[in-house]
Amino acid sequence: MKKVLLLLACTIACVYGENYCAMNSTAQTSCLISGSVCALCFEGGDLVWHLANWNFSWSVILIVFITVLQYGRPQFSWFVYGVKMLIMWLLWPIVLALTIFNAYSEYEVSRYVMFGFSVAGAIVTFILWIMYFVRSIQLYRRTKSWWSFNPETNAILCVSALGRSYVLPLEGVPTGVTLTLLSGNLYAEGFKIAGGMNIDNLPKYVMVALPSRTIVYTLVGKQLKASSATGWAYYVKSKAGDYSTDARTDTLSEHEKLLHMV
């Protein structure tokens, strides 16, 4: 195992040269993949100094990242979820700034190969960032929901009931949608989306909005107990098109609401 670590450290030092193998002596500053030279670089270079002095800090940072990634969901903690979203929103501009700075620094020292890679990385990052905004704006145009700008949101479930529109972000397009009514509380995908409802308030259809289209799910079956306002309703795909999930007025008929174009 030690030999593997030495070989890995030597490889890193060979790639980055003076950055990771700046020796205090007058010896060469680049590593060769040989036993003695590599060991000398690993034991005396800046890499070991960095790990020895910053290993605890990196451990704390990685623990925070693991916690945010694993428990950054609304059902666990809204605070951790907010931290996760903040990190995801900041990553694009930070990466873009780093690639631009690296391109400038590489150009200053005439390392044109690395300059080319840095420019390519900056271009790819910028394109991906623009694509995120385009898809988010398209989704917001259909749903009028700020969940559209959630980096994890690929689709949004829209349910109209009691004269209001309720939304729930989804990671993908479901085959069918089940709405569950428990003691007057309406649940979708395990999340409570509305309260104070009865069996007469369940909609005839629900919608799932994507950046490119809106999918309509029609009610095909339900089982309800009126006395306790408890039951379920199941919806399946019926059509897709350029529909808006936001009905402007309550005076529209069900058919008019469905055909209300964006």
Curated annotation (Swiss-Prot):
Residues 237-252 are annotated as: Interaction with N protein. The keyword Glycoprotein applies. Belongs to the alphacoronaviruses M protein family. Homomultimer. Interacts with envelope E protein in the budding compartment of the host cell, which is located between endoplasmic reticulum and the Golgi complex. Forms a complex with HE and S proteins. Interacts with nucleocapsid N protein. This interaction probably participates in RNA packaging into the virus. The gene is M. This is Membrane protein. The chain crosses the membrane at residues 48-68, 78-98, 113-133. It is found in: Virion membrane; Host Golgi apparatus membrane. It holds the Pfam family CoV_M. It comes from Canine coronavirus (strain BGF10). It comes from the Viruses.
